């Protein structure tokens, strides 16, 4: 299993005091976790099966497990989202999940690149085998989380129209920017595969991520807003 895509079930859920303090400092000041103390971007994808949010704090994760019975967490950011540097937010999440008895899985995606075929197929396998209900999250819960939510819908027989609804302003997704390549992916399936091939068969045999990457042209002003002010990963 590749780096950044591991399933975690730590035998010792406790972080040493100094390491925990350092993780919190990194999470709050480097990962902007202070925004997520009050803002959660929490939504149901399929009630009782899949939920979505921004990256939850350990305390919020505990509340979600208690209220919704979350059994699996899928972290779409990857194990080391900052140029190979370990994330304090991830360390806290791993420890919290282990303490709560919840499976924690890394399944990284990009917010501004054409979705990779191998990552889509791996996520499909995770969805097939995971304990439900599950929570998917990235940093803000807008772009990669919207993609993963749409993939869940298509994998389970839903339409591209329903998948696209998971990428909207409602979740703070800006399609007229570089992150609009995720919308373009669903539109591509709608135009070239839907009604003719099951979604995963289309992904495995016909989807050309390089062609999508070359063809996609993001907006200008909105792209700048998204990439600089919102600091998309």
Predicted regions and their residues:
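Cys-dependent protein tyrosine phosphatase-like superfamily
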Residues: 1-134, 147-233
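Short cysteine clusters
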Residues: 138
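Substrate/cofactor-recognition hotspot
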Residues: 141
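Catalytic domains of cell-wall/extracellular-matrix polysaccharide-remodeling enzymes
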Residues: 144
């Amino acid at each position: 299993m590749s780096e950044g895509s591991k399933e975690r079930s730590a035998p010792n859920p406790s972080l040493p005091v100094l390491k925990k303090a350092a993780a919190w400092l990194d999470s709050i000041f480097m990962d902007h976790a202070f925004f997520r103390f009050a803002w959660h971007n929490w939504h149901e994808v399929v009630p009782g099966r899949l939920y979505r949010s921004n990256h939850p704090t350990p305390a919020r994760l505990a509340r979600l497990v208690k209220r919704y019975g979350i059994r699996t967490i899928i972290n779409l950011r990857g194990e080391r989202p900052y140029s190979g540097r370990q994330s304090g937010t991830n360390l806290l999440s791993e420890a919290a999940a282990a303490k709560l008895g919840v499976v924690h899985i890394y399944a990284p995606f990009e917010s501004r690149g054409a979705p990779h075929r191998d990552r889509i197929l791996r996520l499909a396998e995770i969805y097939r085998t995971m304990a439900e209900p599950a929570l998917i999250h990235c940093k803000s819960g807008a772009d990669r989380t919207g993609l993963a939510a749409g993939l869940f819908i298509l994998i389970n027989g839903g339409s591209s129209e329903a998948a696209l609804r998971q990428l909207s302003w409602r979740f703070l997704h800006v399609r007229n920017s570089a992150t609009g390549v995720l919308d373009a992916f669903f539109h591509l399936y709608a135009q070239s595969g839907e009604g003719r091939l099951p979604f995963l068969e289309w992904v495995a045999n016909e989807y050309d991520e390089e062609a999508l990457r070359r063809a996609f042209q993001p907006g200008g002003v909105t792209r700048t807003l998204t990439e600089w002010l919102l600091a998309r990963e």
